[in-house]
Design a protein with these regions (language model features):
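Short Pro/Gly-enriched beta-strand edge/turn motifs at strand-loop
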Residues: 2-8, 82-84
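Conserved N-terminal beta-strand and adjoining loop/helix that marks the start
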Residues: 6-35, 102
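Residue-level preference for beta-strand/loop junctions
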Residues: 14-16, 45, 93-97
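Short loop segments at secondary-structure junctions
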Residues: 26-29, 41, 104-109, 123-125
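Conserved Nudix-box catalytic region and its N-terminal flanking loop in Nudix hydrolases
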Residues: 30-74
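A short coil-to-beta-strand element that immediately follows conserved catalytic motifs
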Residues: 74-83
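Active-site-adjacent beta-strand/loop module that shapes the phosphate/pyrophosphate-binding cleft
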Residues: 86-109, 142, 146
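NUDIX/MutT-family hydrolases
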Residues: 100-102, 110-144
Length: 147
């Protein structure tokens, strides 16, 4: 094999786009207020867990923190990994793989970037039927997890 052939082939291979999402638990004076969901301003429209794409040269953790600041204006502390979601049909636009974290924050979310609105939902009031992508499955995993 010629030098550099493997690297050239790797550049030609189409791979899933890497994304990250964070289920943000909002706290006020050590009291749980709920989790943040955004109302998307771009298709597919509906409610979503805040998240976005990992940039080249960026770790998924760094991307998660950056996206939370950009999308909902919150400084988030990541507390754990919920899971990795990679069903090729999870995003109707293209194949993505998402690393989903749980994080804690204080304050009020402010819609920005891809968010038309950002709101705090009590766990029992999450409208699961309005969640886009595979976020219903992700939310059910979160709700069924201890903690």
């Amino acid at each position: 094999m010629e030098p550099g052939t493997r690297a050239k082939r790797a550049k030609m291979i189409e791979t899933p786009k890497l994304t990250t999402d964070v289920i943000i638990r909002v706290w006020e004076k050590n009291r749980f207020q709920g989790i943040v969901l955004i109302d998307r301003k771009n298709p597919p429209l509906g409610l979503a867990i805040p998240g976005g794409f990992v940039e080249v040269g960026e770790s998924v953790e760094t991307a998660a923190l950056r996206e939370m600041k950009e999308e909902v204006g919150l400084e988030v502390q990541l507390v754990g990994l919920l899971g990795i979601y990679s069903d090729p049909k999870r995003d109707p636009r293209f194949h993505t793989a998402s690393v989903v974290f749980v994080g804690d924050a204080t304050g009020e979310p402010q819609a920005a970037s891809d968010a038309q609105e950002a709101s705090i939902y009590l766990l029992e009031e999450i409208p699961l039927d309005r969640l886009v992508f595979d976020h219903r499955e992700i939310m059910l995993d979160f709700l069924g997890s201890p903690d």
